């Protein structure tokens, strides 16, 4: 299976372990991520219309191997799956999606007519505390949701569902999994001293956050629930909690 993500650092988070996790479960998945930090649907579309080769091309969760445009990426290989997503700072603002999501989907299907299209539902920011341990960007964006994690979750989920339906794509519900882990499992609830699933207030933690995203992608795209017995040097008990939460996810 070959996957292309037209994304940013949030798809970078999701891709980090996906290739390796798939291999550990007897599957071959090769991923390509088109990375510009914080890139929105609007910016992706502008880059297409100007044919800008400004994306870092990252294979299988690794470092960038060069610069490329979206069109170059789409014609350079045949993909089974192409994913789209909105930038996190706009993920819960519905008017930021149009007309760019439809334009992007049509462009992808023009060059990859056999590929299945998925929309990557991203996740909320960490709960706000004062004084905040996070920076100004976190503060500025989270203010759009009144520093309310539940409000941000509901808005970005509503937007993801609308966007996916609009372009006839399936959802990869990473945001719902992260929200469930934070709310329903003490081991990942920061209020009870659990592991924080973010490393800076918005990007996923380098261990369990990124593992959760990869596991959700693997299950959504292949139907295979990963074996949590061992991965990297992570705690198998925590991996089990993440994996056991995945089949329960509904949007």
Regions found by a protein language model. Give the residues of each.
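Conserved SGNH/GDSL esterase-like catalytic core that processes O-acyl groups on lipids
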Residues: 2-4, 10-98
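Conserved catalytic region of serine esterases and O-acyltransferases that act on ester linkages
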Residues: 187-251
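Alpha-helical cap/lid subdomain in secreted, periplasmic
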Residues: 67-206, 219
């Amino acid at each position: 299976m070959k996957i292309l993500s037209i994304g940013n650092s949030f798809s970078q988070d999701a891709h980090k372990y996906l290739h390796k996790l798939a291999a550990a479960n007897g599957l071959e998945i090769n991923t390509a991520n088109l990375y510009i930090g914080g890139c929105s649907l609007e910016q992706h579309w502008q880059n297409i219309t100007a044919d800008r080769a400004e994306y870092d091309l990252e294979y299988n969760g690794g470092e960038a191997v060069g610069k490329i445009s979206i069109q170059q990426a789409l014609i350079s290989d045949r993909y089974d799956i192409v994913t789209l997503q909105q930038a996190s700072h706009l993920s819960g603002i519905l008017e930021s999606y149009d007309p760019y999501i439809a334009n992007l989907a049509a462009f992808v299907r023009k060059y990859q007519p056999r590929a299945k299209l998925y929309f990557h539902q991203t996740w909320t920011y960490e709960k706000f505390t004062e004084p905040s341990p996070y920076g100004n960007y976190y503060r500025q964006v989270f203010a759009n949701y009144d520093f309310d994690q539940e409000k941000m979750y509901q808005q970005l989920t509503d937007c993801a569902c609308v966007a996916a339906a609009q372009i006839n794509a399936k959802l990869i519900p990473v945001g719902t999994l992260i929200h469930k882990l934070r709310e329903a499992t003490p081991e990942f609830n920061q209020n009870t001293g659990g592991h924080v699933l973010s490393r800076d207030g918005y990007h996923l933690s380098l261990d369990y956050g990124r593992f959760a995203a990869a596991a959700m992608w693997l299950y959504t795209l292949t139907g295979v629930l990963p074996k949590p017995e061992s991965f990297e040097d992570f705690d198998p008990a925590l991996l089990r909690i993440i994996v056991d939460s995945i089949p329960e996810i509904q949007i």
